[in-house]
Regions:
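Nucleotidyltransferase catalytic core that binds NTPs
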Residues: 1-199, 207-212, 222-226, 231-248, ...
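A charged, solvent-exposed segment within the mature domains of Sec-exported extracytoplasmic proteins
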Residues: 216-220
Length: 288
């Protein structure tokens, strides 16, 4: 019996559950599935420039990491990436020639011509027939009946509106971080209540060090629900100033004692009157 070697390719801009379904479906139909990420395509730059979805999460490195994270426990799924720009050297803008260049690189990496090719797009069927003449072509859920989502829609609407469609790897990366500054005794209850309200996680900065913080952040992101909180320690703000500057939202419960120490960190200042409600209003803006 001949070994079934499969091919599934895409840009994964970004990886979503429609892609995941297609890859899992494909892997069940063959002995060995080679998933290819194509990046630096002619149209990719424009798509990223116009994206509402965070551009920093659409780099080739991030897309490849997301694919590898999702399928690391599947022994018959192999992840590869191809720099399409390098394939197109000495070619012109003719789409047939570009596809031919990419398919030659695919065959080189796989070690043979795939005998079964999977796609989620009907429009690519003719290209695949020319590029892999000996292969069976299988089109998966082309009308999006099982997963009514596309990477185009996610880029257009952003990560929060399309959260349920993102892969787990992308949810971990796209979760928004919210830092809460203020005196410990005064904000403890607020931090607890906000974490409960948004059904998410919180990182405590008290007695933090670089290694501990790295592990706690990863854990918080992995278990978060769109957002997660960082409870700042008023005693080590200066030590972690650069870290705080990188977060998505900083909220400062006004206290004259901290005005000077927080002057370099962009914060939303909230008085202790109606603090809980004001926090919610600012947090909800991140979720739009």
């Amino acid at each position: 019996m001949n070994k079934k070697v499969g091919f599934y390719g895409g840009k994964f801009l970004p990886l979503h559950n429609g892609h995941i379904y297609s890859i899992l479906y494909s892997a069940r139909k063959c002995d060995e599935l080679h998933v290819f990420l194509f990046y630096n395509t002619f149209e990719e730059k424009k798509k990223i420039e116009e994206s509402v979805f965070p551009k920093k999460l659409l780099t080739p490195q991030t897309r490849e990491l997301a694919l590898k994270a999702e399928f690391k426990n599947y022994s018959n799924i192999k992840i590869h990436s191809i720099d399409s720009e390098k394939c197109f050297n000495n070619t012109n803008d003719n789409e047939n020639i570009r596809w031919d260049s990419e398919s030659k690189e695919v065959i080189k990496i796989v070690g043979c011509e795939p005998n079964i090719v999977f796609s989620s797009e009907l429009e690519y069927e003719e290209f695949f027939k020319k590029s892999y003449p000996s292969a069976e072509i299988v089109v998966i859920d082309a009308k999006r009946k099982l997963f009514d989502i596309s990477a185009t829609e996610i880029r257009k609407n952003g990560e929060m509106k399309c959260w349920e469609h993102l892969s787990k790897a992308y949810k971990v990366l796209a979760a928004k971080s919210i830092v809460l500054f203020g005196e410990a005794a005064l904000k403890r209850k607020i931090v607890t209540d906000l974490t409960k309200l948004y059904q998410t996680t919180c990182v405590e900065m008290y007695n933090a060090n670089a290694e501990k913080l790295k592990n706690e952040l990863l854990k918080a992101r992995y278990n978060s629900n769109k957002i997660f909180f960082i409870n700042a320690d008023e005693n080590n703000i200066k030590d972690f100033e650069e870290f705080y500057k990188e977060q998505d939202l900083c909220i400062f419960f006004e206290n004259e004692k901290y005005f000077e120490i927080l002057k370099n960190i962009k914060c939303k200042k909230i008085s202790f009157e109606n603090t809980f409600e004001e926090c919610i209003k600012n947090i909800n803006k991140l979720l739009l």
